[in-house]
Amino acid sequence: MNIQANSCDLRSKLPLWILFFFTFYGNSVSAQQMDYYQHINRAEELFVLNHDPSCFKEFNKAFHTKARYFAKDAYIAAQIALYLKDDQKVLLYLKRAFEHGLPFTALTSAPIFQRIETNSIYPKIVQVYQSCQKPTFDAVVRDKIYDQCFKSDSLKFYMGRDSKKIAQFTQYEDSFRDYLKVEFLSKGIFPNENLIGIATDSIYEDFMRRFGHVDPYAAEEKQLFGSTNSIPTEYGLVSKYSFSVLLHSSCSFPNYQKLLYEAVLNGYMQPIEYGLLHETSVSWNQGMKNPHEGCSPLLSDAYYNILGFDPTKSTQTKIDESDTEGMKRVEKNRAAIGMQKYSIDQLKRIDQKNLGIKFFFYFLER
């Protein structure tokens, strides 16, 4: 039985108005998601340029679209509200962040929130968290992602320079990426925090306990230093495990580019993550280390100026700011995927340093 042929036959028999509806609906969802990114970008721009409440109008527009938004964006808005001493908006935006998966243990992720427990608003924040509607994430998918990531980490930890173990590791990671493509990317989604929740220490520890696993990296770190990393995993406000395996491959981006962009348009991948995958596919993987991979790096547009200049690399993705035409290209590439302007990101870095407002520039990978 030719399932593909039958499927095509069925589609050809669908009324035109139904086909038009699904096409229009898909385009509408994508447009709403891009509107969301643009409102968030404009809100950040207004703040770093003016440091006044004018940004809140754009934040509110973003959170009232029918797009799938990210807890980190509402958390950024809450930080700005705290800086501007607007308690009402602090509570409003934290409520939105909690409703979209911000763990309470991540509340103090930003320096500006480090001493929030001593602030008179803190009891109200606790009340908001306790009373708001918490999201439901796919725990079954999360367990499967975590389990595959654990197995990949374990193979990597023990492989050393053993060629057979290295081959076993690369083959396993290939199968992991195939799983992500078949089960998620091919359907326009990616198992990020909007599907499986923000990664937290407590959730990962619970997973390890239920599956009877021991993290070799954490065990070694504890043996050498007496403790593990003191920075909580949830401080990154991402679900990093499924993203890590894509970063490890030079071919993830070239092979899955269109599918990854669909995930961005559907709210299952942040624009900066898409850009980071593009840049790292060129900058981090300039030699084919995996014999099972075969692809050509997409260098021509791999310029977002996320990564810095690396003198050890023969091919750079960093454009010098003195290169006027090159910087126009950077801004064009960023705008095409809904990413913040490079010029505004530079101002955000200044505010992050001086004001303690965390803008979450980098994906955190162990």
Residue ranges and their predicted role:
Residues 53, 63-70, 84, 88, ...:
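Preference for long, solvent-exposed alpha-helical segments and helix-linker "stalks"
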Residues 35, 42, 76-77:
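Structural register within alpha-helical repeat arrays
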Residues 282-366:
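A cross-kingdom marker for long, charged
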Residues 37, 71-75, 106:
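Start-of-helix register in tetratricopeptide repeats
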Residues 1-36:
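Bacterial Sec-dependent N-terminal signal peptides
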